[in-house]
């Protein structure tokens, strides 16, 4: 086992289950209110879960961060997207300048936007962008691995460190997010491997692909799996071979949240795939995750059903984390 994997294993040993006794106390608090018992349904359950996560029966996660993992994906060369890779860094810069939809809704939900450049083609310019580049873009998975195993582990560790930094800065709740042209392709590739499905069964239109573009996307994923032969039982192998740096970074965020005992919200398809991969590395990390909705992408429903998560706030296909911001407002 390489040194970085040993380091990752040691960090994951810090993850412990959430506090059930605190959750019982939180339920008593809720049941003592003048309202129908369990009247808020899944939202009430999630708030009690947050109590157990934070070890506080009356939690107030007032300082919140939306962490956007930005990275470019070489599979764009296969014509699987509507835009080129330059858009990834453009959007990260816009986030730094508070000019994106995500920024507007984050502010409305009382969240600070934290754009992280973990694998863009260039360094971020705006001072709000946290440049933690593991490598400048990934390989074209249709022809080669996305990255080396070592780079994958380094990206996961980077995600963990970002969350630890935010904890030290006083943040109490994390929302996951990503920005990476081509990442619905890499996420669908991971899902196809993990669930043993034909790519056609797990691949959607992403940001509005035409039928021709969708076929290119499916074929690119089939090629990626055939060329790289990822091991479905090895999360790191799957990410390194057919995933992306944004996915690896988000995996680290989920693990980091569990290590730091912080609630972390899952938003959208790519976030859900990353959450699933994180739980392959440490199953207890799931206790710190809160699903906010079920994406319209085909594989998202598979993940939610596999985990028996029924808290589907909405079935949507809105981009830049709008759904999770609505959840935080509630």
Regions found by a protein language model. Give the residues of each.
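N-terminal loops that bind phosphate or other acidic moieties
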Residues: 2-330
């Amino acid at each position: 086992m390489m040194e970085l994997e040993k380091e990752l294993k040691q960090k994951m040993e810090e993850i412990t289950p959430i506090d059930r006794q605190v959750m019982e106390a939180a339920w008593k608090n809720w049941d003592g209110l003048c309202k129908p018992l369990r009247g808020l349904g899944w939202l009430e359950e999630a708030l009690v879960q947050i109590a157990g996560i934070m070890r506080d029966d009356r939690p107030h996660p007032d300082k919140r961060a939306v962490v956007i993992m930005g990275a470019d994906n070489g599979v764009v060369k296969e014509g699987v997207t509507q835009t080129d890779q330059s858009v990834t860094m453009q959007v990260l810069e816009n986030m730094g300048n508070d000019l994106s939809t995500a920024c507007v809704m984050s502010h409305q939900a009382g969240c600070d936007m934290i754009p992280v450049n973990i694998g863009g083609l260039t360094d971020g310019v705006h001072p709000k962008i946290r440049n933690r580049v593991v490598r400048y873009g990934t390989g074209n998975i249709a022809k080669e691995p996305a990255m080396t195993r070592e780079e994958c582990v380094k990206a996961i560790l980077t995600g963990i460190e970002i969350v630890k930094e935010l904890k030290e800065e006083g943040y109490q709740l994390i929302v996951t997010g990503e920005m990476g042209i081509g990442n619905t392709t890499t996420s669908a590739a991971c899902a196809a491997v993990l669930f043993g499905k034909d790519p056609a069964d797990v691949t959607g239109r992403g940001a509005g692909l035409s039928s021709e573009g969708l076929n290119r996307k499916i074929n690119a994923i089939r090629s990626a799996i055939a060329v790289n032969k990822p091991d479905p039982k090895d999360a790191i192998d799957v990410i390194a071979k057919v995933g992306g740096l944004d996915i690896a970074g988000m995996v680290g965020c989920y693990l980091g949240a569990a290590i730091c005992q912080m609630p972390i919200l899952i938003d959208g398809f790519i976030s859900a795939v990353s959450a699933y991969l994180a739980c392959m590395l440490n199953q207890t990390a799931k206790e710190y995750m809160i699903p906010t909705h079920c994406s319209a992408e085909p594989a998202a429903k598979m993940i939610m059903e596999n985990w028996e998560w029924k808290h589907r706030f909405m079935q949507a296909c809105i981009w830049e984390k709008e759904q999770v911001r609505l959840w935080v407002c509630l």
